[in-house]
């Protein structure tokens, strides 16, 4: 599969206009109404920032597939659209994926994971029509999507990614936190522009956040969307000023940083002030933070990430991010 990156992520929503207003007010997205025909009773909006394009769709009819999705999962990511050269190339790549084992859905859309579908689209797709990306935007692009899958389905999901979609595994981790545990594998397209973190609970251990997501979401789905920024400290300060709430990290994490990593490219005092996490791989450092979920089911949330050379994910950050979500659950219980 020779895609060029993520074209857009489509969310199915109870109220697309309300969802768009939150993205505009809290995250600074620019909202537009694409000039494409939609079936009666369907509302479709776009939210743009940098190279990020989110498509927000809601339906008035209760028997519409969009409404069915929302009933099952609440508002959530329903389609990951990957960018091909043009419409003809999108059709060719969808056909190739089906030949290699992908399940066809409709047009150039194939099955993905649970109710998250994968759609091949060309650069000429009407949903992508709009101004050139602003290189100075606070949030630049979608770094990755994290997808929770039921126990026992991670290995088949990875095989599907490799065989039908041509992705490769770039990172694997079995994470134990107290009495809980999860498996994770990160798969990436050959171009490096589409990255999925696949998460599976270990049901031989006590239930944790992946189990709770799967229960509340009624199955597999996108747990979070990570936005890459060139200045995560400024992004956190800016979004916090707009009302976005972030998860916190205990001071002991920062006390241990000098022994674990030595000097960090963002000073430790700034990391501590903003609750930013830091890790590194062979290429450099990365900085991450999760937002507090505002989803009625407490499922979907968002992430900010800045990469300073790091191309994968650090084990310490994965553990710290997991623990941050667990603390939030305990505090809100």
Give the location of each predicted region.
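N-terminal beta-strand motif that seeds the catalytic metal site of vicinal oxygen chelate
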Residues: 1-18, 77-82, 126-158, 218-225, ...
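Core segments of cupin and vicinal oxygen chelate
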Residues: 1-53, 96-100, 109-112, 149-195, ...
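Short, structured motif recognition centered on aromatic/hydrophobic residues
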Residues: 6-13, 23, 29, 47, ...
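C-terminal functional regions that serve as terminal interaction/effector modules
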Residues: 13, 224-247, 253-333
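A cross-kingdom feature marking solvent-exposed beta-strand/loop segments within repeated
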Residues: 31-43, 60-111, 134-137, 143, ...
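Short beta->alpha transition motifs characteristic of CBS
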Residues: 57-59, 120-126, 200-202, 305-309
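Internal, well-ordered alpha/beta segment that forms a basic, Gly-enriched binding/recognition surface
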Residues: 107-136
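Short, structured patches in soluble enzyme cores that scaffold and shape functional sites
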Residues: 122, 146-151, 171, 200
């Amino acid at each position: 599969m020779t895609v060029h990156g993520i074209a857009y992520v489509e969310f199915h929503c109870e109220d697309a206009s309300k969802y768009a207003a939150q993205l505009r007010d809290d995250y600074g997205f620019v909202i537009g109404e694409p000039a494409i025909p939609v079936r009666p009773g369907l509302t479709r909006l776009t939210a743009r920032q940098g190279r990020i394009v989110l498509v927000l769709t809601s339906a008035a009819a209760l028997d519409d597939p969009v409404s069915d999705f929302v009933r099952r999962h609440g508002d959530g990511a329903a389609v990951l659209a990957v960018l091909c050269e043009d419409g003809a190339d999108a059709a060719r790549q969808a056909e190739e994926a089906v030949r290699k084992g992908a399940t066809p859905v409709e047009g150039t859309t194939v099955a993905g994971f649970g109710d998250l579908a994968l759609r091949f689209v060309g650069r000429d797709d009407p949903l992508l029509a709009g101004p050139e990306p602003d290189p100075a935007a606070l949030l630049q692009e979608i770094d990755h999507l994290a997808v929770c899958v039921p126990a026992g389905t991670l290995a088949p999901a990875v095989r599907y990614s490799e065989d039908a979609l041509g992705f490769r595994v770039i990172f694997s981790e079995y994470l134990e936190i107290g009495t809980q545990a999860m498996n994770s594998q990160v798969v990436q397209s050959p171009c490096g522009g589409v990255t999925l973190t696949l998460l599976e609970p270990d049901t031989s251990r006590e239930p944790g956040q992946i189990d709770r997501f799967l229960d509340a979401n009624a199955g597999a789905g996108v747990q979070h969307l990570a936005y890459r920024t060139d200045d995560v400290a400024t992004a956190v300060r800016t979004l916090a000023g707009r009302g976005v709430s972030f998860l916190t990290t205990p001071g002991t994490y920062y006390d241990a940083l000098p022994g674990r990593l030595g000097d960090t490219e963002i000073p430790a005092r700034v990391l501590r002030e903003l609750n930013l996490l830091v890790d590194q791989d062979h290429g450099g450092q990365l900085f991450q933070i999760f937002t507090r979920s505002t989803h009625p089911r407490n499922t979907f949330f968002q992430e900010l990430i800045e990469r300073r050379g790091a191309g994968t994910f650090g084990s310490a950050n994965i553990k710290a991010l997991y623990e941050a979500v667990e603390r939030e659950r305990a505090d809100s219980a």
